[in-house]
Amino acid sequence: MKTLPVTLLFIVSILSFVPSAFAQKDLPADDASTAAFVELCKNPDDIEGRSFCFGFGEGVYQQYLASRAINAKPAICFANKTETRNEVLQKFLAWTKSNPQLNKDQAAKSLMRFFTQNYPCK
């Protein structure tokens, strides 16, 4: 029974030395634009930023699935099941460079455009 408090103390002490374990990134509160999203996502060494980007993109896609009418023809199909999240992100970053006119649009709107243009259902 004495090992439980010692174990908890050990875990708490480890976590106190790893503040980045709880670090978060988010889009700036006053800017949910495509440009702000790209800025957050483009650094491959920023683990928290990349994690946010993957989660945000997944959330946009899941919202699309949840809000699509059951009998509606799907507009987005990820046919290549071997493509990684990072590969999709790299395509998105390249796509935004080719479409700078969308930088002021909301990031979610640009992601939906990207998904429908690059992953259309056939």
Q: Residue ranges of each PLM-predicted region?
A:
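Surface-exposed, polar helix/loop patches in the mature regions of secreted/periplasmic/lumenal proteins
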Residues: R85-K122
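Short, structural beta-strand-to-alpha-helix junction motif
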Residues: D26-T34, T84, L102-Q106
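Bacterial N-terminal signal peptides
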Residues: T7-F17
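Sec/Tat signal peptide C-region and signal peptidase I cleavage site
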Residues: F17-K25
